[in-house]
Structure formats: structure tokens, C-alpha cells
Amino acid sequence: METIVNGISKTLQKNERKMGSEAPAISLEMLDGQTKVIGMLATKVQVMITLPFQNSLTPELSSIIEKYQDQAFIYLISAQTLGEMTNPACSSTDFAELAKKFGVYIDETLCAKSLFIINKDGQFVYKEITKDVEDAFDLEMFETKLDEAIHFKKKGHVHENWMGA
């Protein structure tokens, strides 16, 4: 897979992640100094947002993050500090390992612009990697998929349903 940086096509290095596949577990240092392990089974849906530049975080994306921050673990990962609109407990510049494992690594100074949604079972249910690092995300689709993932109810044998309770 490739992305465009300043008009030049760059090959994204390392792994390409497929929908339904298991997300890799990654330890990330957040800007507040905490280390968090992300990408595994979790009590909430997880969202990984990789942003290439300091100014990549738009007010529209920030609004979606704010709307869903209590219902999902939302992480912003970038090679550069993103500024005041971010929560240091959920933001990281420790991007290289995640970018490699998620297939969005460009080089030691840059990652592709991407969105990943991981369900509670630790599986990828949505991904978007922009064609150009300057392109906008499809935020309407992202919000729809995030809402679906948060409100997904597992089907199958549940004792209470089986007993008619």
C-alpha cells in the first residue's frame, strides 16, 4: 500500500491489517508519561488515529473524539505533538512501533494518516488510510462505523435468552 507525501508516492512499510483480523498488542508511552497496552481484548471499543502532522487534527475529528470519548478508548498517535486539543493521557508521539504493526509507517519521522476501530474482542472492524497525507478522512463513515462498533451486541447462546428470562 502507498500514500502520497508532498506529491511523492511513498510505500507504507511493514504489516497491512485486514478487517476481522486480530489487532496486535502494543505498548505505547502517552504524553502524560503513562504506558498503555493497546490493541488487545478490552472493555470498550478502541480507536487508533494516526496523524502525520501537528496540524492534522481537525475540529471535526476533535468533535467526534469528544462525543465518543466516554464510550471508547480513543488514542491519537503522531510523530509530532498535536497541541492543546488533545488529552495527554490518550495521545502519544511514540508512533514507530504502532505505525509498523498497523501498516502505516512511512519513515522514522512520519506515519500515514489513518483510522482504525478495534472491537472489544480485539479485532479490526474498520480502517481508513488516506491516499495522500493531506487528504481528509471520511468522517461520516468513521462515525457510523464507530457507533456500530460501540453498540454491537454479540449474538449466540446467552443463558438468560435461552431460559427465556
Where are these regions (language model features)?
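Chalcogenol-based redox active-site neighborhoods
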Residues: M1-A165
